[in-house]
From Swiss-Prot:
Tissue-by-tissue expression: Expressed in the medulla and chromaffin cells of the adrenal gland. Expressed in the Langerhans islets of the pancreas. Expressed in the inner part of the seminiferous tubules and in spermatozoa located in the lumen of the epididymis of the testis. Expressed in the cortex, hippocampus and cerebellum of the brain. Expressed in normal and neoplastic mast cells (MC) (at protein level). Expressed in testis, pancreas and brain. Expressed throughout the differentiation process from spermatids to spermatozoa in the inner part of the seminiferous tubules.
Free-text comment on this protein's domains from its UniProt entry: The N-terminus domain is necessary for its localization to the ER-Golgi intermediate compartment (ERGIC).
GO MF: catalytic activity; ornithine decarboxylase activator activity
Main localization of the protein described in the UniProt heading: nucleus
Further facts: Gly-70 is present instead of the conserved Lys which would otherwise be the covalent pyridoxal phosphate binding site.
Species this chain originates from: Mus musculus
Keyword Transcription attached: no
Keyword Transport among UniProt keywords: yes
Protein family (similarity comment): Belongs to the Orn/Lys/Arg decarboxylase class-II family. ODC antizyme inhibitor subfamily.
Protein name, as recorded: Antizyme inhibitor 2
């Protein structure tokens, strides 16, 4: 092991002991605390992060993963991923400082934000971070002045109209402008070494990767014609973090592998990267949030006859809302569904319920239309799949939120991490069997791969 992570950084649990068990212990302790101050906290299963990594290597063996630090910069995550050998994709000075503070060398960092502050470019130059991205002439000029020895990656626009987050509205050079940018880089003696793209989060169409890889091949040809040594292809992110996503990770991987074989075949001398955030951390984190207040509202029309519920609704107020942990309600249009820390009895009546955050305005609604038993102030609600853009969010209500995270890992996952037991070393005869360190899905030999796109023409 490289020494980034030690046993003192997490709670070692035995097989069969779940994060929900640990949450129960922690919520009990928090409820019994005498300070009266109760705040939301996370439990993170680092073993889930390890399993996701092995799954990635199994299905995309030619791709070198970089972790998107801005997705979740909690130290436990950074340390376990550094231990696994990942590179780190940083968007700003603070993220570069953070990963270098834990010992990650500059050679494993890419500053992937194509629109950086001059201070961030100067920091990268001073601290040896040479791999930077750009997508416009202004950014190129800033790099020429502040970091002339940088190795630049040209970020191209993608067809991300089906994605939840359309990054092409903000970032990415059009194919029509790429030759001009490459020519300017050559005239300015700036080395362009590759191409990157990002299809956006929540893209339901894996063929978007194939189209972008085909487009990248065109830009590689332009760069090589102009004398640039093009040897890096960055696939960006957009990989699903949930097992129940519309498009399974294996399906995406199959499409990507087919496109890589066609446009960047093995042995072509191109180093292939990907920047993953949600993929690694979404399902690894669970958050516990307490009820701080409640209000009962009499319904005008009772649904008691249809549902057995009493004729009233209940509004619960939480210590976290959409301007903090539950920001996905605003940005990803999600509807968080809680699990109750205390299991209700079968004969308890259900009430139409809604959950609201602490902001004193009408937009801080976490969830509504829920049917829950009668809950009390001080009770805990548990939300799964809360690892992406939650832990270190900046709240509009009071600056940066320092949220407590308890890390856990099973002994089996710890031993696998220490020995780097990759799936390739397992029994190849049991291909259809999900092993403890598999990705958690059954493997199929019949994944449906659509046609690979051909490069678009450039006018």
């Amino acid at each position: 092991m490289a020494g980034y992570l030690s046993e003192s950084d997490f709670v070692m649990v035995e097989e069969g002991f779940s994060t929900r068990d640990l949450l129960e212990e922690l919520t009990l302790g928090a409820s019994q605390a005498t300070s009266g101050k109760v705040a939301a906290f996370f439990v993170a299963d680092l073993g889930a992060v390890v399993r996701k990594h092995f799954c990635f290597l199994k299905h995309l063996p030619r791709v070198r993963p970089f972790y998107a630090v801005g997705c979740n910069s909690s130290l436990g995550v950074l340390k376990v991923l550094a231990e696994l050998g990942l590179g780190f994709s940083c968007a700003n000075k603070a993220e570069m400082e953070l990963v270098q503070h834990i010992g990650v060398p500059a050679s494993k960092i890419i500053c992937a934000n194509p629109c950086k502050q001059v201070a961030q470019i100067k920091y990268a130059a001073k601290h040896g971070v040479r791999l930077l991205s750009f997508d416009n002439e202004v950014e190129l000029a800033k790099v020429v002045k502040s970091h002339p020895s940088a190795k630049m990656v040209l970020c191209i626009a993608t067809q991300d109209s089906h994605s939840l987050n359309h990054l092409s509205l903000r970032f990415g050079a059009s194919l029509k402008s790429c030759r001009h940018l490459l020519e300017n880089a050559k005239k300015s003696h700036v080395e362009v070494v590759g191409v990157s793209f990002h299809i956006g989060s929540g893209c339901p169409d894996p063929q978007a990767y194939a189209q972008s890889i085909a487009d990248a091949r065109l830009v590689f040809q332009m760069g090589e014609e102009l004398g640039h040594t093009m040897n890096i292809l960055d696939l960006g992110g957009g990989f699903p973090g949930l097992e129940g996503a519309k498009v399974r990770f294996e399906e995406m991987a199959s499409v990507i592998n087919s496109a890589l074989d066609l446009y960047f075949p093995e042995g072509c001398g191109v180093d292939i990267l990907a920047e993953l955030g949600r993929y690694y951390v979404t399902s690894a984190f669970t958050v516990a949030v307490s009820i701080v207040a409640k209000r009962e509202v009499l319904d005008q029309a009772s649904r008691e006859e249809q549902t057995g519920a009493a004729p009233k609704s209940i509004v619960y107020y939480l210590d976290e809302g959409v301007y903090g942990v539950f920001n996905s309600v605003l940005f990803d249009n999600t509807c968080p569904t809680p699990a109750l820390q205390k299991k209700p009895s079968a004969d308890q009546p259900l009430y139409s319920s809604s959950l609201w955050g602490p902001a004193v305005e009408g937009c801080d609604c976490v969830a509504e239309g829920l049917w829950l038993p009668q809950l009390q102030v001080g009770d805990w609600l548990v939300f799964d799949n809360m690892g992406a853009y939650t832990v270190d969010t900046k709240s509009l209500l009071g600056g940066t939120q320092a949220r407590r995270v308890t890390y856990a890992m099973s002994r089996l996952a710890w031993e696998a991490l220490r020995g780097q037991l990759l799936p390739a070393e397992e029994d190849q005869d049991a291909e259809g069997v999900c092993k403890p360190l598999s990705c958690g899905w059954e493997i199929t030999d019949t994944l449906c791969v659509g046609p690979v796109f051909t490069p678009a023409s450039i006018m």
